[in-house]
A protein has these predicted regions:
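Broad gene-expression machinery/nucleic-acid interaction feature
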Residues: 12, 26-28, 57, 227, ...
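Short nucleic-acid-contacting surface segments enriched for D/E, G, S/T with interspersed K/R
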Residues: 2-14, 24
Length: 333
């Protein structure tokens, strides 16, 4: 039936099932719809790899008010667009979990058209519960008490599910925490192929995580898949550092968190100089881009801590980015 109807992994099927003799699980006997379409009509849907990928050009606005300031700063200095492939680089205890919750809340409030999915891999069970209560979206998790095969299987299935939604023209926003733990799980599953990189990472271990991260794109025909994944650094593990280096530069947006800022209780603990978005001119209107660029230039030469102190101090005096940018324009004139 799968081959006859050209069903793709991750599709949502509605049909009739019967329990076979012998007490086995139910077996699908009749397929009524595939992704809400008749099987005949679904076969005409273009495959993900046959669609035309283009640069993100629709800005996902994160600002929801005066607070959280993190979302306002991201809008100006590390904007996200539909189809973005973003990496959140996070040392321990730099506010990664809160950042993800704020990101999910902003997306849910400002962009109800986005299908929000959060994938948690090898996370603490209590963190999973907290995310499910805080995030208004689909939270899928394989917690740390599950076997690594569960991590790999769930991530692969969810990645395919996201692609099926995107090829149907839907706008999908996938938050992955973390791509480091997913790569670790794959490293255990693939075993030892005899080709091991430094840090004990098998050369095949990164194939599937890279495929998942690389699936982020916007389509000329409509639809998009945005992937924002966290990468763990400064954990004391050579493996984690190698995984980060393999993913560094593969995205088109990076948000780098800084432990020194977090130690000073400065939020967001964001290194402005290492964070940014490629081709941000396609996301921000010309005036906003010009003023944000001018701000960066005015802060040039400052250390990350001094930079963020200045940004937080200036922006916290205004209840919106629009008000803040008007103030910037007055200084310019």
């Amino acid at each position: 039936m799968i081959n006859r109807m050209a069903l793709r992994e991750g599709v949502l099927i509605k049909g009739k099932a019967e329990g076979p003799p012998g007490g086995q699980g139910p077996r699908l006997t009749v397929i009524e719809t595939v992704e809400g379409l008749s099987p005949e009509n679904y076969s005409a849907v273009k495959r993900f790899d046959d669609l035309t990928p283009i640069d993100p050009h629709e800005h996902i606005r994160l600002e929801v008010g005066a607070e959280p300031l993190t979302m306002r700063i991201m809008d100006l200095f590390a904007p996200i667009g539909k189809g973005q492939r973003g990496l959140i680089v996070a040392p321990p205890r730099t506010g990664k979990t809160i950042l993800l919750q704020q990101l999910a809340a902003s997306v849910s409030k400002n962009h109800p058209e986005l299908y929000l999915i959060m994938l948690l891999i090898d996370e603490r069970p209590e963190e999973v519960t907290e995310m499910r209560r805080a995030v208004r979206g689909e939270v899928v998790a394989s917690s740390m008490d599950r076997e690594v095969e569960s991590h790999v299987r769930l991530a692969s299935l969810l990645g395919e599910r996201a692609k099926r939604l995107a090829e149907m023209g839907k706008e999908v926003f996938l938050l992955l925490d973390s791509i480091t733990r997913l790569a670790r799980a794959h490293n255990k599953v693939v075993g030892n192929s005899g080709r091991t990189m430094s840090g004990g990472v098998d050369i095949r271990a990164l194939e599937v995580p890279k495929k998942l991260f690389g699936s982020a794109r916007a389509f000329e025909e409509g639809g998009s898949l945005t992937v924002m994944a966290t990468a763990l650094i400064e954990t004391g593990s050579r493996m984690d550092e190698l995984i980060f280096q393999e993913f560094k530069g593969t995205g088109n947006m990076e948000l780098v968190l800084d432990r020194k800022l977090a130690d000073r209780r400065m939020w967001p603990a964001m290194d402005l100089w290492q964070s940014g978005t490629r081709k941000e001119e396609k996301l921000l209107d010309p005036e906003t881009l010009r003023r944000a660029t001018m701000l960066r230039r005015s802060l040039a030469g400052l250390k990350p801590v001094e930079t963020m102190e200045s940004i937080i101090g200036a922006m916290s005096k205004h209840t919106s980015n629009a008000s803040f940018l008007k103030q910037v324009a007055r200084f310019e004139s």
